[in-house]
Amino acid sequence: MEAPAQKAGQGGLPKADAQGASGAREKRPEEPRPLEEDRAGSRPTQKGDLRGAAGGRTTPPGGGSRGCSLGVSPGPGTRHSAGTRPLVREPCGPTSSQNPELVIPEGLQAREGPCRSPARGGDCSRNSCLAWHRGAPAGETPPVCDPCPERIQNHPRTQLCEVHTDCWPCQPGTGAPTCPRTPKPTSRGRNPLVEQPRACACGEAFAWRALRIPQERLQATEEPRPCARCGKRFRPNQQQQAGKSPPVCPECGQTSRPRPIVPDPPAQRLYACDECGKAFTRTSSLLQHQRIHTGERPYECAECGKAFVRCSGLYRHQKTHSAERHRRGPVLARRAFRLGCPPCGDYSERSPRRGSGAGEKPYECADCAKAFGLFSHLVEHRRVHTGEKPYACPECGKAFNQRSNLSRHQRTHSSAKPYACPLCEKAFKGRSGLVQHQRAHTGERPYGCSECGKTFRGCSELRQHERLHSGEKPYICRDCGKAFVRNCSLVRHLRTHTGERPYACGDCGRAFSQRSNLNEHRKRHGGRAAP
């Protein structure tokens, strides 16, 4: 180590300084000199530094080259910031053995080539790397200069991360600039220092650390955000870090980016029905629902007199009539037709739907040639031929081909009968049963047979009667193959195979498979027929 010391003395350093540096190495070989000792004497002032930069050199006003507190000789890229710990950047070429003022920490050897440091976790071959190992806090990585990959030591208390823009690599032993990205000096004769903003945990950059701290505190108070796949919650600083991709959820393996927390919608006011307790968000929906309990049907068809609870039901019903009854001109199919609401007298212009105008039935069944005005009606009808019953009752397992039939069947499992007759106080589980019962009081029979002219109170009774003329028997026994017109006839027939006798006499206890047989038996006892 004597040859480098003599070389440093010949290069322009005063002997006193060289001897002082040698004495410092003997007393404290592992610790650098305090920064306060070099602020007045050994470190060049900012004014002298600017004058040196203007001339392309960094020599202090005294003339000779002097080293800084870390023992690194000032070079073309060395610069000190006023009021803070000096930023040391060594050129890219010289190795640690060419700087006699640099105190090598224990565990590192002054040699040519790369060195291994466990504190940094990699190879280093430059004096700036050794300076960092010497004075950097444990576990902290030196910052990177923007134009070149040199590491520059930065004091931890420095609020601004100042980065040299005039940094260039140089050849070993020379000071000639060779980096093509070196900016030109400014008009004042110095190269500017760029403020490198600090990145917060959320990715937002702040130039001053004082602005970054309130942002970190604000993020610490935010609610955890759940993962979109597994629901596990993460804090914002765990979800998105500066310059890094979002973390991977350990439960589902998916990345979860921060999402804005959407507030819950305000609670809606509900209007409940006094009869059944069903709630609605609008009063108009509640009024329409109450007509089911009261039996009110204000919308009546002008052709057949059939009434409906809603105006939409009347509109769908009017399309079932023939086109001749609704046709009011030769160009009605190409123009809008007038739909009238008799209760309120409102008439609105509406255009017939494509393929389903007034009286038109474009959808025809391929099996029985029955036509329908809507495609959804054809789909429901096709289940009659295919035997598909996708709607099953969760109570008894009975399946149906339509959802409406399942809804009516589910009422049979409950004992509630909300539909009561105002004349005889007889109650029913469904609205259709109440309507057919009221026709028994009025004597109304709106459904007539086209073959024999017989009238019926309900549409289902008319369909069952028409099967007598057509000979259709859709209900077949699986045990013996016998067919029936009505489903109730098939149910009574199945009791002959199962032996079920649900109707028992209250006097003698004799049971029967049909209610009619029980009534005949009770007449022998002189009693009334079974209810």
Curated annotation (Swiss-Prot):
GO terms for biological process: regulation of transcription by RNA polymerase II. Pfam families: zf-C2H2. Residues 1-101 are annotated as: Disordered. A zinc finger (C2H2-type) spans 271-293, 299-321, 363-385, 391-413, 419-441, 447-469, 475-497, 503-525. Residues 24-50 have a biased composition (Basic and acidic residues). It is found in: Nucleus. Keywords: DNA-binding, Metal-binding, Nucleus, Repeat, Transcription, Transcription regulation, Zinc, Zinc-finger. Its main location: nucleus. GO terms for molecular function: DNA-binding transcription factor activity, RNA polymerase II-specific; identical protein binding; RNA polymerase II cis-regulatory region sequence-specific DNA binding; zinc ion binding. GO terms for cellular component: nucleus. It comes from the Eukaryota. Belongs to the krueppel C2H2-type zinc-finger protein family. May be involved in transcriptional regulation. This is Zinc finger protein 837. The gene is ZNF837.
